[in-house]
Design a protein with these regions (language model features):
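Flexible "arm" and connector segments at domain edges
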Residues: 1-122
Length: 122
């Protein structure tokens, strides 16, 4: 399965309510429906769950990742992927383009010897 095929398939599972538009209550800062709210917050939550699995491995198993914990991490990584794909869809990006852009950025940083640096635009 390609990333774009994954994106198309996973979007069919997007069953969440979109918040009301602030436009109709007079807010000048935001004038569109916040379609991205749930997926953005969900991405943070799922990424936290991945980190939590590693934290418990450190706490409970001296950092070893057991087979059961490994499978639990795989499930959470899948959830992270769903939210990344959904946000990409809502923002009008093809997932393959997002992934290629990331490779291009990392390649450029590596070629300029700044991959270990700090900052988004290094």
């Amino acid at each position: 399965m390609t990333p774009n095929e994954y994106q198309e398939q996973t979007h069919s599972f997007a069953c969440y309510e979109k918040p009301i538009s602030y436009e109709n209550i007079g807010c000048q800062m935001i004038t569109h429906e916040l379609d991205w709210t749930y997926p953005a917050l969900g991405l943070a939550e799922e990424a936290g769950e991945v980190v939590g699995k590693f934290a418990k491995a450190v706490r409970d198993e001296s950092g070893n990742i057991s087979g059961e914990r490994r499978e639990a991490i795989k499930k959470e990584l899948g959830d992270v992927c769903w939210f990344v794909a959904e946000l990409s869809t809502l923002l009008g990006f093809k997932l393959e383009d997002v992934l290629q852009h990331n490779i291009d950025k990392l390649t450029d940083r590596k070629n300029r010897n700044v991959i270990k640096g700090s900052g988004d635009n290094r």
